[in-house]
Amino acid sequence: MDMMEQLSRIGIVPVIAINDAADAVPLAQALIDGGLPCAEVTFRTAAAADAIKNMTEAFPNMVVGAGTVLTCEQVDRAVAAGAKFIVSPGLNPTTVKHCQEIGIPVCPGTANPSDIEVALSLGLKTVKFFPAEAAGGLKYIKSIAAPYVDMKFMPTGGVNEKNLLDYLSFNKIICCGGSWMVPGDAVKAKDWDRIRTLTASAVQLMLGLEIAHVGINSTDEAEAMDTAAKLCKLLGWTMKVGNSSIFAGTGIEVMKSPFRGAKGHIGIKTNFIVRAKAYLERQGFEFDESSANVKDGQLKAIYLKDEIAGFAIHLVQK
C-alpha cells in the first residue's frame, strides 16, 4: 500500500507544531489512542526533526511526515529523522524533484490550475490544497478538479469539525489536514487527555458509526413474512420484501432463512466504509473478507470475522 493510500484510509492528518521534542512521544500516544496513528510535524519550529525522530522511534508503525518543508536540506533532515512523507505549503519543483530522487513521497501545496499543471508535469497524482478555506474551500476545489481527472487533493488550512465531512465526501479528496484536535494551548499545557478526546471525537465524526438495522433469522420465508408483518403492525412501519429478506421499516431486517449470527445480525452504517474498516482493524477487529459486498469497484458492506454476543456484525456504507 503506497503512502497516499495509507493517508486516505486514515482520513485525517493532524498538523502539529512542537516546540519541545520531549512532548513528541506523549503527543503521538494521545493521537494513536484517539484513533489517528498519523501526524504531520511542521518545520515551523527548531524541534521538528527531533520530534519526528522521537515519534518514529517510539512508534515505528505510526505514519509520521514532515510539513512546512521549504528546502532540500529540510527534506534531508526530515528523512534522516524518520519522516515517511513530505508536505510543503507551495510547489517548488526543485524540492519535489529532490524528494522523487531519494524516494520519499511528497505532497506539495497548490492553490490554482497553474500549480496543478506543474504538479502533473512532475508526475504527481496527489497535491495539498492550501490554504483551503482562504483559497476558496470545497467549492473552489470542485471547480478546478474537473479538468484534472487523475489529480487528488489533501486540503489543509481552515478545515475543522464543521466542514470536515463536506470535504471528505468529495471523491477527489483523499484526506484532510487539520490542527483542531491538537490545539496549541493543549500541547503547551501537556494536556494529552484533551488531545486524545478531541482526536477521538474527530474520528467518530468522520466515520459516523451508528446502528443501521437489526437482523432476525427465520426458518423459512413464511415465518419471515409473519414476523415482518407483526412488526410493521406493531410499529406502524412499511414492509419491503427483498430477495433474501424482508425489511420492517428500515430498522429491522427479517431474513427468509437461517443466516449469519446465532441470534441474528447487526448492521452498522458509516460515512466511509473503507476508513471504518481500517480503523476497526487498528482496534484489533478482524473482517471476513469473503463476505465483502463490492459494487462498481466500491466496498458496500462487510462482516466482522467473529460474532459479538451471538450477533454477526457488518459495516454498511451510508
Language-model regions, residue ranges each:
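N-terminal beta-strand motif that seeds the catalytic metal site of vicinal oxygen chelate
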Residues: E5-A17, V203-A228, G261-I268
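Glycine-enriched alpha-helix->loop->beta-strand junction motifs that scaffold or abut catalytic
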Residues: I32-P37, A58-M62, A80-I86, E101-C107, ...
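Vicinal oxygen chelate
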Residues: G251-K256, E281-K318
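Glycine-rich phosphate-binding active-site loops on the catalytic face of alpha/beta enzymes
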Residues: P89-T95, K128-L138, K172-I195
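Conserved N-terminal beta1-alpha1 strand-loop-helix module at the mouth
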Residues: M1-A81, E101, E161-K162, A189-Q204, ...
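Catalytic beta/alpha-barrel core
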Residues: V15-A17, C38-T45, M62-L70, A83-L91, ...
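Catalytic cores of alpha/beta
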Residues: L27, T71-A81, S114-L122, K139, ...
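Amphipathic alpha-helical segments
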Residues: E221-L235, A276-G284
